Amino acid sequence: MAYQMASLKIEMKEVVHVKPSKPTPSIVLPLSTLDHRPYPDSIWPIVHVYQSPSNGQLDPAFVLKQALSKALVYYYPLAGKLVKQPNGKVAINCNNDGVPFLEAIANCELSSLNYLDDHDIRIAKQLVFDFHPQQDENEYPHPVSFKLTKFQCGGFTIGMSTSHIVCDGWGACKFFHAIVELASGKSEPFLKPVWERERLIGSITTQPMPNPMDEATAAVSPFLPATDVMYELFKVDKESIRRLKMSLMKEISCNESMEQGFTTFESLAAYVWRSRARALNLNNEGKTLLVFSVQVRQHMSPPLSDGYYGTAITEGQVVLTMKELNEKPLSDIVKLVKESKNVAFTGDFIKKTIDTLESNPENFNVEEGPGATLALSDWKHLGFMPNVDFGWKEPINMVPAPCNMFEYEGLCIFLSPSNHDPSMEGGVRVFISLPSVAMPKFKEEMEALKVITP
């Protein structure tokens, strides 16, 4: 039975600032051009859910703070503050300010919350650090913060909030892994971090990449703008994914050759994009944009160091009119997603992206009608689950908490299944936000995945 939100009480302790356990350099470090792609105050919070440790003598808050302090010796920029430079760009002042850490105690057991597997957004938001609004335009949140909440069963959650201008998802995961390794007794992290942001600084170009969509042609929804936005987590099991892929291959004509099949990401991305557009009832002649993050660390020449933890993503983009998206065979849309992803991996595209962002950052702020753009992020392969064991047990779940950058309509995240639901092994969880009036239609589209005929 779901826990009653009104009954959930969380007692907060005083915020402390965890500093590196050893002296670290006091310098100001510049960020890369790609680091500046997100807004400087964009924070992405996630909640890691742990069952009660087998050794009940260990205090998870003490262990985490000790490990964090050790990890900050290697990741010392994360103990600093973001500052605006005279040229308008953001840098990180490595001033040893420390990482905000908040300890809390909940009045219930994790099982009463179903280990957040139902993903009640109101609960998830209480389990991450609440950043206060910036006081002026030159002040930004801390690069990272933690909130550890203990539950009556002995289990706990770790809410980690990271500034997207300092780390992308891969980088944040490596930082978390370093903390875990040190908490479990290692003397140093296996993967040593490197800064090297100069590798991704662009040049001014007179031929920037064109904006993929403009306000005049963007599709609009009668349901947007909306004040009543819902967040839902949909479970797509392994069998539904298999049937979807088989149906896509059947759509392809016998005369058409496919050197490789469709990936789970490509298949679900196209399906979710179309389902969302239908749910929003976008106008037929308007254009809709699917934009998704593409990890390019290994596609640079030479590849970035494994220890690089800054933003290293470009974006795949597909633009169709609503009529095309609604009426084309789904396999055609999946092919467009695959092609766009492959282009985003190329050295030429990576360079053009960086140079365009350096020359004209506004080009990446897509002008759109309400609901025209779906921004999709794939977290399945970041590595947050399951190999993040603090020496007790693996995490049972990991979920996003929609604060700040997540708190707008138009975002979708693909997640790995939780360890709480064995039936979802090999499946995908789809986290999405929509106006309340549009959610029933989207649910109908997602339910249809279960009855697709291969």
From Swiss-Prot:
Source taxon at top rank: Eukaryota
Chain segments annotated as coiled-coil in the UniProt record: none
Applied uses, from the record: Disrupting the production of quinolizidine type antinutritional alkaloids (QAs) by selecting inactive tetrahydroanabasine acetyltransferase variants is a potential kick-start for the domestication of novel legume crops.
Catalytic activity of the protein: tetrahydroanabasine + acetyl-CoA = ammodendrine + CoA
GO terms for MF: acetyltransferase activity
Pfam family, one: Transferase
Record-linked Gene3D superfamilies: Chloramphenicol acetyltransferase-like domain
Record key words, sorted: Acyltransferase, Alkaloid metabolism, Transferase
UniProt-listed GO biological process terms: alkaloid biosynthetic process
Keyword Transferase found: yes
UniProt pathway: Alkaloid biosynthesis
List of catalytic residues: H164, D389
UniProt EC number: 2.3.1.-
Family: Belongs to the plant acyltransferase family.
Assembly: Monomer.
PANTHER family for the chain: ACYL TRANSFERASE 4, HXXXD-TYPE ACYL-TRANSFERASE FAMILY PROTEIN
Protein role: Tetrahydroanabasine acetyltransferase involved in the accumulation of quinolizidine type antinutritional alkaloids (QAs) natural products. QAs impart a bitter taste to plants, acting as repellents and toxicants for herbivores and predators, and possess a variety of pharmacological effects, including sedative, anticonvulsant, anti-inflammatory, antiviral, antitumor, antipyretic, anti-hepatitis B, antifibrotic, antiallergic, antidiarrheal, analgesic and antimicrobial activities. Mediates the conversion of tetrahydroanabasine into ammodendrine.
Name of the protein in question: Tetrahydroanabasine acetyltransferase
Phylogenetic lineage: Eukaryota, Viridiplantae, Streptophyta, Embryophyta, Tracheophyta
